[in-house]
Amino acid sequence: MKKEILEVFDNTYPDRNYTIEIVNPEFTSVCPKTGLPDFGTITVHYVPDRTCVELKSLKYYFLEFRNAGIFYENITNRILDDLVAAMQPRSITVTTKWKARGGITETVTASHTAQG
């Protein structure tokens, strides 16, 4: 996954706290154990500081995971780390909610709050 794909633009209202919610209901990756596809919904909530993530670049970033063998927990934390690196938000939470596999569902949430 190439985090360099992520682009940002200047936040016009950096003095105001507001929350942006981004939902990708068609996220796909591959189970590293079975090689079978995994399907999930990725939700990102963040309070921007100086920059916001550009949605087209985020879409292409998410597509990078399509053929990657990676566990749910690692996907969630990788997305969080890459978004923090790209835009340094005041706060951000990434939640991944996975379709049932063998009758079991999983939801993973990872968060970050800027220091200072």
Swiss-Prot record:
Known catalytic reactions: 7-aminomethyl-7-carbaguanine + 2 NADP(+) = 7-cyano-7-deazaguanine + 2 NADPH + 3 H(+)
Binding site for substrate: V53, E54, L55, Y72, E73
Tagged with keyword Chloroplast: no
Pathway: tRNA modification; tRNA-queuosine biosynthesis
E.C. number(s) listed in UniProt: 1.7.1.13
Location in the cell: Cytoplasm
Record-level GO BP terms: queuosine biosynthetic process; tRNA modification
Gene3D superfamilies per record: 3.30.1130.10
Record keywords: Cytoplasm, NADP, Oxidoreductase, Queuosine biosynthesis
GO molecular function, one term: preQ1 synthase activity
GO cellular component: cytoplasm
Role summary: Catalyzes the NADPH-dependent reduction of 7-cyano-7-deazaguanine (preQ0) to 7-aminomethyl-7-deazaguanine (preQ1).
Stated family: Belongs to the GTP cyclohydrolase I family. QueF type 1 subfamily.
Name of the protein in its database record: NADPH-dependent 7-cyano-7-deazaguanine reductase
Lineage of origin: Bacteria, Pseudomonadati, Chlorobiota, Chlorobiia, Chlorobiales
Protein's gene: queF
